[in-house]
């Protein structure tokens, strides 16, 4: 048991080392896009399933409240939170439409969709991306493995943050770190701090 625990730490560390080489440019570009979106008076919508739904909520909470510095709230909405809406859409239409219908109602040109799926193949996240594109939104995707079908929907205006791993747990761990990097860069770009203080 102890060895399995130690192995999990070691694998997580190695995946983060690999990601530290592969992901900084994508994360920086995504953060720049998000800053531009927010400065333009737009918002960020986020979606995912299971642990990725938790990540979407974590991201929106950090923007709506604060990350590490005192600042005004920033507009972000996790589309996985409204159980009445989600269950109504799933019951009346399809589970694949639980995010896309919300995006058709809430998404505006200039908004960003943060689409999260460890496999890149979640049907409802793919439909969300299609809806976002139809609303002239840009997309930041957080994926892993080979990027799945989500990778094929992205244009040069979008950003893919693809974790270099095939292990779901390791991908989720790096997704959380990437989200924290996004929040940190958004905060320090919009609200520069005196590092000497």
From Swiss-Prot:
It catalyses: 2 D-sedoheptulose 7-phosphate = D-glycero-alpha-D-manno-heptose 7-phosphate + D-glycero-beta-D-manno-heptose 7-phosphate. It is found in: Cytoplasm. GO terms for biological process: carbohydrate metabolic process; D-glycero-D-manno-heptose 7-phosphate biosynthetic process. Pathway: Carbohydrate biosynthesis; D-glycero-D-manno-heptose 7-phosphate biosynthesis; D-glycero-alpha-D-manno-heptose 7-phosphate and D-glycero-beta-D-manno-heptose 7-phosphate from sedoheptulose 7-phosphate: step 1/1. Its EC number is 5.3.1.28. It comes from the Bacteria. GO terms for molecular function: carbohydrate derivative binding; D-sedoheptulose 7-phosphate isomerase activity; zinc ion binding. Its main location: cytoplasm. Residues 34-196 form the SIS domain. InterPro entries: GmhA/DiaA, Phosphoheptose_Isoase, SIS_dom, SIS_dom_sf, SIS_GmhA/DiaA_subfam. Gene3D superfamilies: Glucose-6-phosphate isomerase like protein, domain 1 (3.40.50.10490). Its cofactor is Zn(2+). Substrate binds at residues 49-51, 62, 91-92, 117-119, 122, 172. Keywords: Carbohydrate metabolism, Cytoplasm, Isomerase, Metal-binding, Zinc. Pfam families: SIS_2. Binds 1 zinc ion per subunit. Homotetramer. NCBIfam families: PRK13936.1. Catalyzes the isomerization of sedoheptulose 7-phosphate in D-glycero-D-manno-heptose 7-phosphate. Belongs to the SIS family. GmhA subfamily. This is Phosphoheptose isomerase. It comes from Shewanella halifaxensis (strain HAW-EB4). The gene is gmhA.
């Amino acid at each position: 048991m102890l060895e399995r625990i130690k192995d999990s730490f070691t694998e997580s560390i190695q995946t983060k080392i690999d990601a530290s080489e592969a992901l900084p440019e994508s994360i920086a570009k995504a953060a720049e896009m998000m800053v531009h979106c927010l400065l333009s008076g737009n918002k960020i919508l986020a979606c995912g399933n299971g642990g990725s739904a938790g990540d979407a909520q974590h991201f929106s909470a950090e923007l709506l409240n604060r990350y590490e510095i005192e600042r005004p709230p920033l507009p972000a909405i996790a589309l996985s939170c409204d159980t009445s809406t989600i269950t109504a859409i799933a019951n009346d239409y399809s589970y694949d439409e639980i995010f896309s219908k919300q995006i058709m109602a809430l998404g505006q040109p200039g908004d960003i969709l943060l689409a999260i799926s460890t496999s890149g193949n979640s049907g409802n996240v793919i439909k969300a991306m299609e809806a976002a594109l139809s609303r002239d939104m840009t997309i930041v995707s957080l994926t892993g493995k080979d990027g799945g079908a989500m990778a094929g929907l992205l244009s040069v205006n979008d950003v893919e943050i693809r974790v270099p791993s095939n292990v779901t747990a390791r991908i989720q761990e790096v997704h959380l770190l990437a989200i924290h990097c996004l929040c940190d860069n958004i905060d320090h770009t919009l609200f520069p701090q005196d590092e000497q203080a």
